[in-house]
Amino acid sequence: KQTAYPVCGQGFTLTAALPAPVDGWEVGAYGIRTPVLARAETLPPETLDLVLAPCTAFDEAGRRVGMGKGYYDRFLPRCARAAVYGIAYEAQKVDAAAAGPLDVRLDGIITERGIYTWK
């Protein structure tokens, strides 16, 4: 198994990247370390087994709310065989997340209190 990391690109694209072993990281948006895409190996979304998606909110129906740019909304439908789990704090749980009709339902959420699963 390998661990790929998300790289946000122009046009609100998201790429799964394996960082190069030497000088493979840079500081990206929001001060977050991200793989240097020019030196990374990229993985096609359809080959991924598991995707961890950040959430600003989630509900018990498996709906997630992201940051509003749609990176994961465009990426997740291409991850047909992957289990998709959100990453959030328990305090981000809401009664009904404002997800849109194109949003991909999560298989579960991982919080500091445990793992919720729905599918």
Where are these regions (language model features)?
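Extended, well-folded interaction surfaces typified by the phenylalanyl-tRNA synthetase beta subunit core
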Residues: 1-42, 89-96
